[in-house]
Amino acid sequence: MSWSVEKKREIISTFGRNVKDTGSTEVQVALLTERIDHLKHHFLKHKKDHHSRRGLLKMVAHRRRLLKYLKENNMLHYTNLIRNLGLRH
């Protein structure tokens, strides 16, 4: 599965406030979650790809910070987002 423009548009339309909303916290978390899932499948085949693993860890940390920000500022959006994405928090 490649990271396509159509997939990005689909995520933005699902989690964004409008079509051009790419900067909201919800959209950023959803996009990061999609990239993290893509890399998880990559590591099933390429176990020794440590360079990409470091990038994965950075993405997970960034997503965690964004979720913390969202939880502190808008609990309703936070709970809806983690329910829709299937995250454990």
Curated annotation (Swiss-Prot):
Transmembrane segments: none
Name of the featured protein: Small ribosomal subunit protein uS15
Family: Belongs to the universal ribosomal protein uS15 family.
A Pfam family the protein falls into: Ribosomal_S15
SUPFAM superfamilies: S15/NS1 RNA-binding domain
Keywords: Ribonucleoprotein, Ribosomal protein, RNA-binding, rRNA-binding
CDD domains reported in the protein's UniProt record: Ribosomal_S15p_S13e
Record's subunit section: Part of the 30S ribosomal subunit. Forms a bridge to the 50S subunit in the 70S ribosome, contacting the 23S rRNA.
GO cellular component: cytosolic small ribosomal subunit
InterPro entries in UniProt: Ribosomal_uS15, Ribosomal_uS15_bac-type, uS15_NS1_RNA-bd_sf
BP GO terms, sorted: translation
Function recorded in the entry: One of the primary rRNA binding proteins, it binds directly to 16S rRNA where it helps nucleate assembly of the platform of the 30S subunit by binding and bridging several RNA helices of the 16S rRNA.
Keyword Ribosomal protein: yes
Disulfide-linked positions: none
PANTHER family attached to this UniProt entry: RIBOSOMAL PROTEIN S15, BACTERIAL AND ORGANELLAR, SMALL RIBOSOMAL SUBUNIT PROTEIN US15M
NCBIfam families: S15_bact
Species per Swiss-Prot/TrEMBL record: Blochmanniella pennsylvanica (strain BPEN)
